[in-house]
Regions:
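Extracellular carbohydrate-recognition regions
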Residues: 21
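Calmodulin-binding basic amphipathic helices in cytosolic, intrinsically disordered/coiled-coil regions
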Residues: 24
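Aromatic/acidic, Gly/Pro-rich catalytic loop(s) in extracytoplasmic/lumenal soluble domains
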Residues: 1-15
């Protein structure tokens, strides 16, 4: 009866000064309406109060290991909480194609501020180390191929003379 699904919108963000204070507040918070955030995790321009549209919806429309897509319907600004572990090293969020910050919510989950009339929130796992590793792999493969060609070239002319 207390499950909130893959994503939901809250009407309030409650900030706490320390992780201990946040953990203590977890036992007393109604997560259906309130999200807990550490002071230093919340950008200064974020609103802490939201008036929820009674018809507002957020649904998971696509789920892959490295990509999650949510469809959003709201006529008022909102704050969405996602039942996904907050892992800042590699996960990027976009809202209608524009990058948005991912906020650490309720100590372990993700949150995103949603403006009125937004339609798609997408999370992608794109860690920098994977991109660097891919570049290094292609560079190594290229150098290996060049080495083979150079050795083959010299062997060919060595056997001809």
């Amino acid at each position: 009866p207390n499950a909130l699904g893959p994503a939901w919108m809250v009407s309030e963000i409650e900030t706490k000064a320390t992780p201990d204070a946040l953990l203590e507040a977890l036992n007393k918070t109604d997560f259906k309406t309130t999200a807990l955030v550490l002071d230093h995790d919340l950008p200064a321009d974020f609103s802490k109060q939201y008036t929820l549209d009674s018809l507002a919806q957020i649904t998971l429309s696509k789920a892959k290991p490295d990509q999650l897509t949510y469809r959003v319907q709201t006529t008022t600004p909102a704050f969405a909480v996602f039942s996904e572990m907050h892992y800042p090293k590699g996960w990027k969020a976009t809202l209608d194609g524009k990058p948005v910050p991912i906020i650490n919510v309720n100590y372990v989950l993700r949150g995103v501020q949603v403006p009125a009339n937004a339609s798609v929130i997408e999370f992608r796992f794109e860690p920098a180390v994977i991109k660097q590793g891919t570049r290094l792999r292609w560079l190594s493969l290229g150098l290996f191929a060049i080495s083979i060609l150079v050795l083959g070239y010299f062997e060919y002319f060595k056997t001809r003379s």
